[in-house]
Regions:
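Conserved Radical SAM active-site core
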Residues: 1-20, 26-35
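Radical SAM enzyme [4Fe-4S]-AdoMet core and its adjacent flexible, acidic
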Residues: 5-6, 14, 33-36, 40-166, ...
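Membrane-interface junctions of multi-pass transporters
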Residues: 168, 172-192
Length: 192
């Protein structure tokens, strides 16, 4: 049976220059061939588990035993975890096998609108991220994009990103199929 690692190796052999993997980290992490593993960590133990179920300890154990240091935490900031940004930054800095942390704001899909942040809350989170950058935390986002993310004043969709999810190919991501969602996009990479 083929593994995710087999697919990463095959993509490299096909000529893809960069092969990144996005994961929730609940399975052992053995992907040294991946350029970057974007691993969802949505806060400290309490907040992460409130967002993603009781997975925090499993994820941290899997990171400890990962076969490479190509992991980047990937946090979607929302109403539940907005006060844990500093914690995730410091955890990224202090955890073996973690190279950096990357952020997004929650994109308010119809069934999760209550999790979205106000403009003021986004600005506050960006100030915390900037402080962490100044402390030397390896943040994988561009500070110059923060004003656009706070105001939602960047062009969407991102035509450079193509996502295959459950057999459906989308420009930018699955949010493109939800009416009026692109204008509320929280993906930092789109503005960057």
């Amino acid at each position: 049976e083929r593994t995710l690692r087999d697919l990463v190796v095959e993509a490299k052999e096909m000529g893809f220059l960069i092969v990144n993997v996005v994961t929730n980290g609940t399975f052992p992490i053995d992907l040294p061939e991946a350029d970057l593993i974007l691993l969802s960590l949505d806060g400290d133990r309490e907040r992460h588990n409130a967002v993603r179920g009781d997975t925090y300890d499993t994820i941290m154990e899997n990171i400890k035993h990962a076969t490479s240091d190509n992991i980047c935490f990937y946090m979607a900031i929302n109403q539940i975890n907005k006060d844990a940004v500093r914690h995730v930054c410091r955890t990224a800095r202090d955890t073996k096998n973690v190279r950096a942390v990357s952020f997004n704001f929650h994109t308010p899909y119809p069934d999760t609108r209550e999790l979205s942040l106000s403009r003021e809350e986004k600005a506050s989170c960006c100030r915390v991220i900037e402080e962490m950058m100044e402390e030397g935390v390896p943040v994988f986002n561009l500070k110059s994009a923060f004003p656009y993310l706070i105001d939602g004043s960047f062009p969407t969709p991102c035509r450079q990103c193509v996502v295959m999810e459950n057999g459906t190919l989308s420009t930018c991501g699955r949010c493109i199929s939800v009416p009026d969602l692109c204008c509320q996009c929280g993906y930092f990479f789109v503005a960057e």
